[in-house]
Structures are given as structure tokens and as C-alpha cells.
Amino acid sequence: EAKATAERHPDGIVNLSVGTPVDEVAPSIQQALADAAVEPGYPQTVGTPELRRAIVEWLERRYAVTGLEESNVLPVIGTKEAIALMPTHLGVGPGHTVVIPEVAYPTYEVAALVSGARPQRADSLMQLGPASPTFMFINTPSNPTGKILGLGHLRKVVDWAHQRGTIVASDECYIGLGWEGEPLSILNPDVNDGNITGLLAIHSLSKSSNLASYRAGFIAGRFDSQSNNFAVQHA
């Protein structure tokens, strides 16, 4: 009934199911892709130094993320696949727990199940009690609610995770699209006091640059000893 009502609107219905963009890709991006089409070949698994440097500079310029090196960045061929395989490649497996938001992007749960871990839904650290999960996904701004996790909340998550050795993957694909307030990256030093151990930020050009289906994104942060395994297996 709600859908039928929306379809009767003069401007038509807006499909929010998968966030498909309705605007065209920026002409400058179209031109850059066309120019690069004459250079076939497989890319470096970890990305070119120029690309990784550009990502580091962009994070600092846009989101005040400082202190990153090029080695802290891994370009990925689509963030959906990277998210789905991230716990597995970082050593999560049977007997482990992966915490995911109560209402969330379905691929977080898929990621836990693929690794063989147990997914646990929780929006509050209090819900987890004394447990020490191996891995945690957070999402700010949230898909689908739009909720932004504030500075105080993020600092508590980081401190809690550092005490327990929990890896935190912050899905920041919508960080440039906050409706209320200014979203913060988990890699911002105001959040982590300069200690990014076990903290990963996920970014997708599908949202920030209107490039859905282009399979372009990256992960930034400080990977643990499994980082090389992650980079190689994601190739």
C-alpha cells in the first residue's frame, strides 16, 4: 500500500533498496576512465604507490585522519566482497564471535558466517557483558538508519576493543553523507589518541563518488599479522 502511494507521486518512486544512484558519474571521472582504457594490464595487488598516497592525503584532507602511511592502505575490488571476506582473512574462525549492529547491512552477518564464527547483534557494549569478541563491525553513518556514532561513543568502542584485542572494522561508506552532525572516522586521532592498532576503516567510491558498480574502494588502518594474507587473498 505504501509503495502504491509513493508510485502515484508526480515525481515517481525513489528505490532505496540497494542505494542505486540516479545522477550521472562526474564527467571528469568518465574522462579519466576513458583515458586509462588504452593501458591494459593487471593492477598491483596493493595498488600503485600513487594511488595509496592519494588515499592517505584524501583521508587527511577530508576527515582529519593523520599519521597514516601508504602501507596502511589497501585498495579493494568492491567493498562488499572485502567486507564478506575480511574476518576470514584476518584470522577469525570457528569458536570466535563477530559483533554486528542490530539493524545493518546484510553482508556483515554473511562475513561472520563465511568465517565460521558466531554473529552477535548488539548496538551497545553493555549488551556484550564481559565477553571478548574477536571482531566487530560498526557503521557510521548507519545504513539504513542514518545514525551517526558520536565522538564519545567511538572513543568508548576503541578503548573497549583495545583492552580486549578486538578488531574493529568501521564501515564509513556514507561518512560524507551525514544528515545530522559531522561523522567521524574511527581513524581520526580525536577518536583513538593516535593508536590505530586493530582499527580498520572501510570506504567505497560507490557512495562518495557516485560510482556504484565500478567496484572501487579501500580499507585503511593498522592490520595485524594477517595483513599480508588479507592483501594476497583479496587479489
Predicted regions and their residues:
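N-terminal "arm"/small-domain region of PLP-dependent enzymes with the aminotransferase-like
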Residues: 1-43, 164-166
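A general structural signal for well-ordered alpha-helical segments in protein cores
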Residues: 2, 26-30, 51-53, 154, ...
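Short catalytic/ligand-binding loop motif for oxyanion handling, primarily in non-cytosolic enzymes
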Residues: 23-26, 144-146, 176-177, 209-212
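Generic enzyme active-site microenvironment
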Residues: 169
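Walker B catalytic acidic pair
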Residues: 172
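Conserved core segment of the aminotransferase class I/II
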Residues: 191-235
